[in-house]
């Protein structure tokens, strides 16, 4: 049963590998959007350089209703254990933690924050 459907424009490169995801909706001042997108790519590269199996992607909503003025940021890990370990490392001062702080500094407000376990569903239609 499909519980949610919508359209999104990918603003940063990523490979669709559903798994355990932190999903946030953020408001960014228009003049900071480019810097924010760049900062997400810097963070992802720093995490991968540190050996993390992680992806970070940013999407703009199409037909997003009341959340149409926000960006969706999805951080992808293979499972909950991996995601939890990354949070522990980040709070302990991992080499990439300053890149995370720099990215967060460009966020004006967090509109929504959740952890989701996602999968791709194929239909016969």
Name what the model sees in each region.
Residues 1-125:
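Short S/T/G/P-rich N-terminal loop/turn motif that feeds into the first structured element of a domain
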């Amino acid at each position: 049963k499909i519980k949610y459907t919508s359209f999104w424009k990918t603003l940063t490169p990523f490979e669709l590998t559903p798994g355990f995801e932190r999903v946030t909706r953020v408001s960014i001042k228009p003049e900071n959007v480019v810097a924010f997108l760049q900062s997400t790519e810097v963070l992802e590269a720093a995490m991968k350089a540190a050996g993390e199996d992680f992806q970070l992607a940013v999407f703009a909503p199409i037909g997003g209703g009341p959340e149409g003025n926000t960006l969706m940021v999805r951080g992808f890990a293979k499972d909950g254990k991996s995601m939890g370990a990354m949070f522990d490392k980040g709070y302990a001062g991992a080499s990439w933690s300053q890149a995370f702080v720099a990215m967060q500094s460009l966020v004006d407000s967090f509109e929504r924050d959740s952890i989701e376990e996602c999968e791709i569903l194929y239909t016969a239609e």
